[in-house]
């Protein structure tokens, strides 16, 4: 499946594809051997090959035979001795009705088993110092096809060297030691699969929901900035709004997710293939690099998840200003960073502890997945489809195609996930959720007690879930896409578990997860007739503007603007009366030709030069907000504010000119462009001479 681990979001994706759902496949089959003495008994794990003889499934059906210790003598016959049968009857052979325990030598398992069978033994335990010992890779083939070797009729199993020492220490001096070999049925399912299911679905749901909240917060900030441009009736409010806007911009810069482009998808898949091949050929060296990358990413992810919670506590106020510097250090965040680093170091030290270290690994893994889902964003459904299908092809290739090119016939993905059999480090990739088996089985004694799920099976579909929730926030669809995609992920994971149970082998989980999430998202978008918006990610075009940001149209003007219009009418009437009384030469109506319009836009309000290039050439015609460009997220509707036209020519007004100028300057909207640094553009009718 997939693999993950890095500090930066892009680096984390480069390792996303190395983790698998595939549980390590056993070389041979696992069984148990029950060792019984007068006052002591214990079960040990063995690895046997069903190519010879299958072991009984129940202990009651397994013969309890005497144990013969042959570890101090060599046990490798010559090839010619295979065809020399014993003349004596089975009862007269030295190992009759015994199970022989011998050391691993230079000959094959078959040779040792044939020699024990020829001596009358009913079973053979081969002691091996190697880990992950295979039972089938050491079977020798006869050099002469015309003389086939005789078939084995006794079970041959591999016992670990440490277990042999434990048996000898407990049975020292005891002459009556008996053993029974059996292979109990493994449970088809285990309760730990339910825990893995909850962890995976919960992480995907939480990560997608968090990403959607960030999108909603960003949209609210933009709407607040859009409405804040007209609220400048006093200088204090203006300064406060500017400071708040700068703080918002800083937060957006720190929390802004990284958009993932199709070019990045190709680069990630190419580099992931390279990393997979490096792990396949240089596993013992490169696995430590992966552990280091996971440690850095996990500590960062844990910090990013806990920091927002810490910011709501009273301890947030404690800060320390560095002497001679303008930088302040927040003590709670500094302590939190140290705590996250300590947790990661604790896991690194005890990562191979099977009893409790998996709790730390799962905690760090969930935090890391949430961090990546927050910080990496697929901006369109087109990018999501390309990304998920590329990883699906990557997964299928390394699971089903690579066995055609490997010497052992196993896929590179399985070798990397379970670790090479000849690995000297015995390390495992940490980019997995692992939960121990909760039911007793042979795997519990055989150091195979965990079920695993790769981070890639969580994060890769999680990107689509996060995109769906962001789109919900943009089109205000009551989280329809988010809920549908999350349920589809849960169903796909259940199908993966069922397929693994039915086929008795690991499954490429992305084959089911990608199919279920993509098809469900497409179906929802098609039913809602939003496929084009969903495909291009243009959901923000449907967000209604705030009332304070609407154009100056009679039907959309707020109560505050209506009061200002009423005040304008009263002021105009007073001007008309003054003109009629003093000069009698002016008309009593200012009319449409007396109107002056100030065109404002968000670009002009936020641009350092005070105007935008797109504002050149605009006229005083009525603008429909639906016809304005929506390509740039910062482009807002133009706002038109009616102002009072300076009244007639100076030669005709006399001292009324002075009175009107003084009166106009006292109006709250006059001089707005001077205080705000905005460009004022007069209409053609306002510039025409009287």
Curated annotation (Swiss-Prot):
Tell me the domain of life. Eukaryota
Q: Which GO terms describe its biological process?
A: acrosome assembly; fusion of sperm to egg plasma membrane involved in single fertilization; intracellular calcium ion homeostasis; membrane protein intracellular domain proteolysis; protein stabilization; spermatogenesis
Record annotation: effect of changing residue 457 to A:
Loss of aspartyl protease activity. Reduces interaction with FREY1 and FREY1 protein stability
| Cross-referenced InterPro entries | PA_domain, Peptidase_A22B_SPP, Preselin/SPP
Q: Gene3D superfamilies annotated for this entry?
A: 3.50.30.30
- One short Pfam name that applies is Peptidase_A22B
Effects seen without this gene: Knockout males produce normal-sized litters when bred with wild-type females. Mutants show a partial loss of elongated spermatids and reduced motility of mature spermatozoa, but preserved fertility. Matings of male and female mutant mice exhibit reduced litter sizes. FREY1 and SPPL2C double knockout mice are normozoospermic infertile.
Q: Where does the protein principally reside?
A: endoplasmic reticulum
Q: Which UniProt keywords apply?
A: Endoplasmic reticulum, Glycoprotein, Hydrolase, Membrane, Protease, Signal, Transmembrane, Transmembrane helix
What outcome is documented for mutating residue 455 to L in this protein? No effect on interaction with FREY1 and FREY1 protein stability
Catalytic-site annotation from UniProt:
395, 457
| Regions of compositional bias (Basic and acidic residues) in chain numbering | 564-573
What is the protein's membrane topology class?
Multi-pass membrane protein
Gene Ontology CC:
cytoplasmic side of endoplasmic reticulum membrane; endoplasmic reticulum membrane; lumenal side of endoplasmic reticulum membrane
Q: Where is this motif: PAL?
A: 508-510
Compartments it resides in: Endoplasmic reticulum membrane
In the UniProt record, the signal sequence range is 1-28
Using the record's annotation, list all stretches that form the PA domain: 87-166
Q: Where is the composition biased (Polar residues)?
A: 615-624
About its domains, the entry says: The PAL motif is required for normal active site conformation. The catalytic domains embedded in the membrane are in the opposite orientation to that of the presenilin protein family; therefore, it is predicted to cleave type II-oriented substrate peptides like the prototypic protease SPP.
Q: What does this protein do?
A: Sperm-specific intramembrane-cleaving aspartic protease (I-CLiP) that cleaves distinct tail-anchored proteins and SNARE proteins. In elongated spermatids, modulates intracellular Ca(2+) homeostasis by controlling PLN abundance through proteolytic cleavage. During spermatogenesis, processes SNARE proteins and impacts vesicular trafficking which supports compartmental reorganization in maturating spermatids and may play a role in formation of the acrosome.
Protein name, UniProt field: Signal peptide peptidase-like 2C
Q: Which organism is it from?
A: Mus musculus (Mouse)
* GN (gene name): Sppl2c
């Amino acid at each position: 499946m997939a693999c993950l681990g890095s500090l930066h979001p892009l680096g984390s994706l480069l390792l996303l594809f190395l983790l698998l759902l595939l549980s390590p496949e056993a070389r041979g089959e696992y069984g148990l051997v029950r060792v019984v003495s007068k006052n002591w008994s214990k079960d040990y794990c063995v690895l046997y090959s069903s190519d010879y003889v299958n072991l009984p499934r129940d202990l009651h059906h397994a013969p309890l035979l005497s144990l013969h210790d042959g570890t101090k003598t060599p046990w490798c016959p010559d090839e010619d001795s295979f065809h020399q049968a014993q003349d004596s009857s089975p009862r007269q052979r030295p190992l009759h009705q015994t199970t022989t325990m011998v050391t691993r030598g230079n000959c094959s398992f078959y040779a040792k088993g044939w020699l024990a069978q020829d001596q009358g033994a009913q079973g053979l335990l081969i002691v091996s110092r190697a880990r992950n010992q295979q039972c089938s890779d050491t079977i020798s083939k006869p050099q002469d096809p015309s003389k086939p070797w005789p078939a084995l009729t006794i079970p041959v199993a591999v016992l670990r060297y440490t277990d042999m020492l434990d048996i000898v220490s407990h049975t020292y001096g005891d002459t009556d030691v008996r053993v029974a070999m059996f292979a109990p049925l493994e449970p088809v399912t285990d309760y730990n699969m339910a825990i893995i299911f909850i962890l995976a679905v919960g992480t995907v749901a939480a990560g997608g929901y968090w990403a959607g909240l960030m999108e909603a917060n960003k949209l609210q900030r933009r709407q607040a900035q859009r409405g804040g441009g007209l609220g400048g009736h006093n200088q204090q409010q203006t300064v406060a709004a500017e400071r708040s806007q700068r703080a918002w911009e800083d937060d957006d810069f720190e929390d802004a997710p990284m958009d993932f482009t199709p070019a990045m998808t190709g680069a990630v898949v190419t580099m992931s293939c390279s990393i997979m091949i490096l792990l396949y050929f240089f596993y013992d060296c490169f696995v430590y690099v992966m552990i280091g990358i996971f440690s850095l990413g996990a500590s960062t992810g844990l910090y990013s998840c806990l920091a927002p919670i810490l910011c709501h506590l009273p301890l947030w106020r404690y800060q320390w200003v560095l002497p001679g510097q303008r930088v302040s250090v927040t003590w709670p965040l500094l302590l939190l960073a140290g705590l996250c680093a300590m947790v990661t170091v604790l896991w690194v030290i005890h990562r191979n502890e099977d009893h409790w270290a998996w709790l730390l690994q799962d905690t760090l893994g969930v935090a890391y997945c949430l961090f990546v889902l927050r910080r990496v964003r697929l901006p369109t459904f087109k990018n999501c489809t390309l990304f998920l299908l590329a990883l699906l092809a990557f997964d299928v290739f390394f699971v089903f195609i690579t066995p055609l090119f490997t010497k052992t016939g196993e896929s590179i993905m399985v070798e990397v996930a379970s670790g090479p059999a000849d690995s000297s480090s015995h390390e495992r990739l940490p980019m997995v959720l692992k939960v121990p088996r909760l039911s007793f089985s042979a795997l519990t004694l055989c150091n195979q007690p965990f079920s695993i799920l790769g981070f890639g099976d969580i994060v890769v579909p999680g990107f689509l879930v996060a995109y769906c929730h962001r789109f919900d926030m943009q089109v205000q669809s009551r989280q329809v896409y988010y809920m549908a995609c999350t349920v589809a992920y849960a169903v796909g994971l259940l199908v993966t578990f069922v397929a693994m149970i039915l086929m008795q082998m690991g499954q490429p989980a992305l084959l089911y997860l990608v199919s279920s999430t993509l098809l469900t998202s497409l179906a929802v978008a098609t039913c809602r007739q939003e496929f084009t918006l969903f495909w291009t990610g243009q959901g923000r075009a449907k967000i209604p503007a705030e009332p304070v940001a609407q154009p100056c149209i009679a039907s959309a003007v707020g109560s505050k603007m209506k009061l200002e219009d009423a005040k304008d009418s009263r002021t105009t009437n007073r001007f008309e009366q003054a003109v009629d009384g003093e000069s009698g030469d002016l008309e009593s109506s200012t009319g449409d030709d007396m109107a002056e319009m100030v065109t404002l836009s968000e670009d002009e309000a936020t641009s350092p030069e005070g105007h935008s290039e797109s504002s050149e050439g605009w006229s005083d015609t009525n603008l429909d907000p639906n016809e304005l460009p929506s390509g740039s997220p910062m482009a807002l509707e133009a706002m038109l504010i009616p102002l009072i036209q300076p009244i007639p020519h100076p030669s005709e007004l006399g001292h009324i000119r002075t009175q009107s100028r003084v009166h106009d300057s006292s109006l709250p909207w006059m001089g707005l462009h001077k205080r705000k640094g905005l460009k004022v553009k007069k209409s053609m009718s306002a510039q025409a001479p009287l």
